[in-house]
Amino acid sequence: MSAQSTASTLPPLGTGKHSRYLGIIALIATFGGLLFGYDTGVINGALEPMSRELGMDSTAQGWVTGSLAFAAAIGALGCGRISDRFGRRTTIIGLSTIFFFGALACVFAPNVAVLITGRTLLGLAVGGASAVVPVFLAELAPYEIRGSLSGRNELMVVGGQLAAFIVNALIGNLWGEHDGVWRWMFAICTLPAIGLFVGMLRVPESPRWLLRVGKREQALEVMKRIRSTERAEAEIADIERTLQAEATTQNNAAGKESVGVRGWFVRILLVGILVGAGQQLTGINSIMYYGIKVLKEAGFSESAALIANIAPGTIAVLGSILSLRLMERVPRRVMVITGYSSTAFFHVLIAGASMLLPADNAARPWILLVLIVCFVGAMQTCLNVSTWVIMSELFPLRVRAAGMGISAFSGWMMNGVLSLAFPVILGAVGLTGSFIGFAVVNVIIALLMFRNLPETRGVSLEQVERGVMDGSIYPSAGKH
């Protein structure tokens, strides 16, 4: 397929009031990403004090951490279908209330069971936001800036994680000797939940979703608020043509043809699952969830680890900012394949340093910290933003939220498994064995991405959809 065919038929994007309004919508919607980041990152510093107060062993720690990820898998899968039925905006408003009450449950949890319940509620909201917010942004964005606009959500995710690390360090070092200090760490996340709820009440629905459910006038009205009038009318017409082509395909599908229709969905779904699960297999959340444990294993004291843990969070934000600048300049495939190759390289360096540097070497924790920061920087620059953008772009409109939900489900399930297993693995084989394992897996994923990942940069969602359905978008078609 031609990546430029849509560019040649649509009027120029232009700038003005509509561009500023689109930016405001993106800012409000990405509060879901901020909550996603804070709620996944807060456990990093809260785990040690809550373990002491509630008498948690390593198994309980794994369940408190992993319960969010497993619930997020369910949230991602369920909210894809919910947003298809009720709309992206309505679903995000509902998620904001779950964020709020999940945080309150954690704040007032008297025991591990209630804490896991609160973390499960937060997980449902985190997973739902991870599936719905990127789709909402992708459906609002013009193709020229879709990567950078959709990628802002991941910037807010890592911004939320950094905020959690800073809050953890401040509260932990100033009031760490007091009971219940971890409750204040959780209490902070009620504030952006309120902001998301209030903000989304003033945000319009996705015009693509409105068209899919037959609300053309509303869709055109929304599109005119975020595009010039000429561009809005042209985009609406293009979306309608694609929907009509889909309807024709469905009506004509029978016998062998219906198997072919199912075949294109299975193929792109397998790619989406690879993208979603692969991100987690980088081992990034071994640092974002268990950074304090990893840094203590490297040789830092608990108070020093709380402060040192801010460094990976900071580089994650800087890497995401750089990634947003690269998204419209570098092909998605290049970003992803480079990302998995570079993370594998730093995995090997971390494992080597851990094995070769003796535990009593004063430089050991600092060398490992630098290598961990390099790993996080490479991953966040090349993979984190691009992963969520790609998953939001891959699927045709009528299965977009469901496909995104299943892809995110695979990622969150892998996240949950690693969250449960990592403390045990770290205790059994240390940093060396853990990161050698990650390195081997990431080399394999890089090869799979090279063979199977489509290129979606610089192409409208409707053009991607046509390429997915006729197979021309894949590397094997000779386009890349």
Question: Each PLM stretch: what is its role?
Answer:
Residues A234-D238, L418:
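A short, aromatic/hydrophobic, helix- or strand-capping loop or linear motif
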Residues R225-E235:
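Short intracellular "coupling" helices and adjacent cytoplasmic loop segments at the cytosolic face
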Residues M1-Q218, K224, A247-H480:
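Alpha-helical transmembrane bundle of multi-pass membrane proteins
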Residues L243:
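Short Cys/His-rich micro-motifs in 6-15 aa windows
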